């Protein structure tokens, strides 16, 4: 017989921890660039009975019966994704961005083939060739980086390495890069050497959807993304591609690397894509960028150095070496003050990955709460105060109180705290 108790009765320990996490999110400043807050509608879809349904295969071609409804759900997600990004084909089944990238590699290359990708040390992602990741274990990785003069991608180096190594795949994208990615120039290089171009737009997908960052779709064989971050959907992945690659790509996801899709998550993706198709989503993305630029100027006014001097998108990297701090110390001190960031490697970082010389800061979550330029100026000042006295418990306590007061003016998930 099915248990009928609600969570608070059935498992009070988990219920309590969920309330605590909701309170932490509601009462603190979330500045991790890869995090955001989903809408109540997305949460509702995630908690739906769709979680009960197994649906191996694709709409209209399932290996299980009873898929009439989930076929419609998944097709809605596919159609909305294609409309949102102007793509020929969309696969909404990847459980995460890593699976999306794995499928893209397997669709276009064989183990041992050469992949030219941005180094993790300069802002790339683990799945772009880190030796501890499947991508670095299965493929020959040639990394590209930044120019020291302005800390932007060295396109001359990309072209030189492409001509020298003739990669099968040119992987474009980053997890800690604050400047515009010029996909047209990357595509010229890929075409010159006969490489297939794959773009991982996980961080900037929302900006791309809103027309605030150049779209990779017209230039790329395959585009991968997560569905959270700036896109403000559930945690998950997605792949866009040209029709010529659709069949191969689909087979790489299922049965290649995944079994049954998570239809409750796919429903939540569909809801988020529907939200992103509305005019107010473009206004939201504009505010993300505006807030990032105001926050960047505020951090510089607080005496902090930003990698490349600023930002074109939703995030920025703060170089803490002038403050004689590590990213680990800064993350911990800011956390005590109710400000959540993540320690992050900076270009040519002398520290280890679990220590780092920098922090990464982003504005999507605070923008979702409704905060604007005035609040960004205040947040920058609060960060500056903490980093000027990271070991002063009185300063941290005062800032934490101010953070809580600020958050109270922008309530979130009030019915869940």
Swiss-Prot record:
Q: Which reaction does it catalyse?
A: (6R)-5,10-methylene-5,6,7,8-tetrahydrofolate + glycine + H2O = (6S)-5,6,7,8-tetrahydrofolate + L-serine
Question: Has the keyword Transferase been applied to this entry?
Answer: yes
The pathway is:
One-carbon metabolism; tetrahydrofolate interconversion; Amino-acid biosynthesis; glycine biosynthesis; glycine from L-serine: step 1/1
One record GO biological process: glycine biosynthetic process from serine
- Keyword Amino-acid biosynthesis attributed: yes
Please state what class of enzyme this protein is: transferase
> Which residues does this entry assign to the site Plays an important role in substrate specificity?
228
Its annotated compartments are:
Cytoplasm
**Keyword annotations:** Amino-acid biosynthesis, Cytoplasm, One-carbon metabolism, Pyridoxal phosphate, Transferase
Where, by residue number, does (6S)-5,6,7,8-tetrahydrofolate bind? 120, 124-126
The prosthetic group or cofactor this protein requires is: pyridoxal 5'-phosphate
| N6-(pyridoxal phosphate)lysine sites (modified residues) | 229
Q: Which SUPFAM superfamilies match?
A: PLP-dependent transferases
Q: Which Gene3D superfamilies match?
A: Aspartate Aminotransferase, domain 1 (3.90.1150.10), Type I PLP-dependent aspartate aminotransferase-like (Major domain) (3.40.640.10)
| GO MF annotation, one | glycine hydroxymethyltransferase activity
What does the record give as EC number?
2.1.2.1
InterPro entries in the cross-refs: PyrdxlP-dep_Trfase (IPR015424), PyrdxlP-dep_Trfase_major (IPR015421), PyrdxlP-dep_Trfase_small (IPR015422), Ser_HO-MeTrfase (IPR001085), Ser_HO-MeTrfase-like (IPR049943), Ser_HO-MeTrfase_PLP_BS (IPR019798), SHMT-like_dom (IPR039429)
Of the GO CC terms on this record, one is:
cytosol
Q: Could you give the subunit structure recorded for this chain? A: Homodimer.
The UniProt function text for this chain reads: Catalyzes the reversible interconversion of serine and glycine with tetrahydrofolate (THF) serving as the one-carbon carrier. This reaction serves as the major source of one-carbon groups required for the biosynthesis of purines, thymidylate, methionine, and other important biomolecules. Also exhibits THF-independent aldolase activity toward beta-hydroxyamino acids, producing glycine and aldehydes, via a retro-aldol mechanism.
Q: Which NCBIfam families match?
A: PRK00011.1 (NF000586)
State the family named in the UniProt similarity comment for this chain: Belongs to the SHMT family.
Q: What is this protein called?
A: Serine hydroxymethyltransferase
Lineage at the top is: Bacteria, Pseudomonadati, Myxococcota, Myxococcia, Myxococcales
What gene is this protein a product of?
A: glyA
């Amino acid at each position: 017989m099915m248990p009928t108790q609600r969570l608070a009765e059935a498992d009070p320990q988990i219920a309590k921890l969920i309330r605590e996490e909701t309170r932490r999110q509601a009462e603190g400043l979330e500045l991790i660039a890869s995090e955001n807050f989903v809408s109540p509608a997305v949460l509702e879809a995630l908690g739906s009975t769709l979680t009960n349904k197994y649906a191996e295969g694709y709409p209209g071609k399932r290996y299980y019966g009873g898929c009439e409804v989930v076929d419609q759900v998944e097709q809605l997600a596919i159609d909305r994704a294609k409309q949102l990004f102007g793509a020929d084909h969309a696969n909404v089944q990847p459980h995460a961005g890593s699976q999306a990238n794995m499928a893209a590699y397997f669709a276009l290359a064989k183990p041992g083939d050469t992949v030219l990708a941005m180094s993790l040390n300069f802002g790339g992602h683990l799945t772009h060739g880190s030796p501890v990741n499947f991508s670095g274990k299965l493929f020959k990785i040639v990394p590209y980086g930044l120019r020291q003069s302005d800390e932007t991608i060295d396109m001359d180096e990309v072209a030189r390495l492409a001509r020298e190594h003739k990669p099968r795949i040119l992987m474009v994208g980053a997890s800690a890069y604050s400047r515009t990615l010029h996909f047209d120039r990357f595509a010229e290089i890929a075409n010159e050497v006969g490489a297939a171009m794959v773009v991982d737009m996980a961080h900037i997908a929302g900006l791309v959807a809103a027309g605030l960052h150049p779209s990779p779709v017209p230039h790329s064989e395959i585009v991968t993304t997560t569905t959270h971050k700036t896109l403000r959907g559930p945690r998950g992945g997605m792949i866009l591609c040209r029709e010529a690659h659709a069949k191969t790509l689909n087979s790489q996801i299922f049965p290649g690397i995944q079994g049954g899709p998570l239809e409750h998550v796919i429903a939540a993706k569909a809801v988020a894509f529907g939200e992103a198709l509305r005019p107010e989503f473009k206004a939201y993305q504009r505010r993300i960028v505006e807030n990032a630029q105001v926050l960047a100027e505020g951090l510089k006014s607080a005496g902090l150095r930003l990698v490349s001097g600023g930002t074109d998108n939703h995030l920025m990297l703060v170089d803490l070496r002038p403050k004689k701090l590590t990213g680990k110390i800064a993350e911990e001190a800011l956390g005590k003050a109710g400000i959540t960031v993540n320690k992050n490697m900076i270009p040519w970082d002398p520290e280890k990955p679990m220590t780092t010389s920098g922090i990464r800061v982003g504005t999507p979550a605070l923008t979702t709460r409704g905060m604007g330029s005035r609040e960004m100026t205040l947040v920058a000042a609060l960060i500056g105060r903490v980093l000027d006295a990271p070991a002063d418990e009185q300063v941290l306590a005062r800032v934490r109180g101010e953070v809580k007061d600020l958050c109270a003016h922008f309530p979130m998930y009030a019915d869940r705290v």
